[in-house]
């Protein structure tokens, strides 16, 4: 008889004996020359159990299972160094300290361990972005890019239903520094919003020296905040004010400063030139 047949016959006999004693063996591998001992009192120690089971053979190891606090769970395993008849030990009715022990073959449970699969991360294709400068060397920057035009379509076939196409929303990536604006407004319907500008006017004035010296030039900065939006009269005032240069003329006769805008100055100058031209024409005609 081969070793496999003896092991199978022994396992079948041990299972029958265990069922007859009132418990069912778990699935696993039967350990040779090892006996399961149940019903151990918490007052029993390994030395007493070793001395008791030496009648069946040379005891190699006694292992009592305990919890985290070190208290016995009431069962353990006894290993023999020699070949012993495990069936004979299981069939025998053994009482220890007035308590009947539950005997059976030692079975090691089969632990199913699933090896985790390695995680593979796919990196996107690097994008070579070259930046050239006349006064510096070329720099190459590696960064992923997403096309703003490309659309991705993913097909998900199922055996119980026809294939489905799920269209994903394209993602756009805008490069900084490159802007192109193409307005689509019809003619004469565009409206502009201007932020509130702050203008600073420098008034150049000349103060008269009371001692009779030369006029002293001075500069008086004045801040003025003007709001403008659309083509309304307020915007017209802003356009005129941005081009206005205020002149300060000193009138020695009246002893006061008169402020004349550029518009009034040009108007007076134009009238002066017209009058001068008329006088020249009259002289030539004479």
From Swiss-Prot:
One of its GO terms (cellular component) is mitochondrial cloud. One of its GO terms (biological process) is spermatogenesis. It is found in: Cytoplasm. Residues 33-114 form the RRM domain. The keyword RNA-binding applies. One of its GO terms (molecular function) is translation activator activity. Keywords: Cytoplasm, Developmental protein, Differentiation, Oogenesis, RNA-binding, Spermatogenesis, Translation regulation. InterPro entries: DAZ_dom, DAZ_RRM_vert, Nucleotide-bd_a/b_plait_sf, RBD_domain_sf, RRM_dom. Its main location: cytoplasm. SMART domains: RRM. The keyword Nucleus does not apply. Residues 155-180 form the DAZ domain. RNA-binding protein that is required for primordial germ cell (PGC) differentiation and indirectly necessary for the migration of PGCs through the endoderm. May promote meiotic cell division during spermatogenesis. Shows a preference for G- and U-rich RNAs and probably binds the 3'-UTR of target mRNAs. Stimulates the initiation of translation of mRNAs through the recruitment of poly(A)-binding proteins (PABPs). PANTHER family: BOULE-RELATED, DELETED IN AZOOSPERMIA-LIKE. Interacts with the C-terminus of pabp1 and with epabp. Prior to oocyte maturation, found in a complex with epabp and pum2 proteins and spdy1 mRNA; pum2 dissociates from the complex during maturation. Belongs to the RRM DAZ family. This is Deleted in azoospermia-like-B.
